[in-house]
Amino acid sequence: MTLLLDSHVLLWALYAPEKLLPAARQAIENPSNMVFYSAGAVWELELKAAKGKLSLPTDWLEAASATGFRELPISAADGVMSARLPWNHNDPFDRLFIAQTMTRRWKLVTRDSYCKLYKADCLTA
């Protein structure tokens, strides 16, 4: 199974795995699963840190890489798909994560309810 972690799930997986529901934690920690984070998650988290809404360790990206998580770049097709999704939800990062998982047929790991608004494959974190 291939997983894409929502921004908050990425941080939980790195620094607070006890916040994850058991099924999500098992899926993320299962060595047979491939675990990705979107370049959009990096953008979102760094924006929040720059605005003072979030405190990030300076080496958090290195920690993600050391854990074995892989970065998923944002493609032009991802941008088109996220813009063409029904407007059930307005957050551009959430829309991007939905688009990225739908086009690749991956599973999005999130605690947010927006995932239920689309025909995406989601695992509740």
PLM features: what roles do these ranges have?
Residues 1-37, 50-62, 104, 113, ...:
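Short, well-structured N-terminal submotif of metal-dependent ribonuclease cores
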Residues 12-13, 48-49, 85-86, 100:
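A generic structural signal for short
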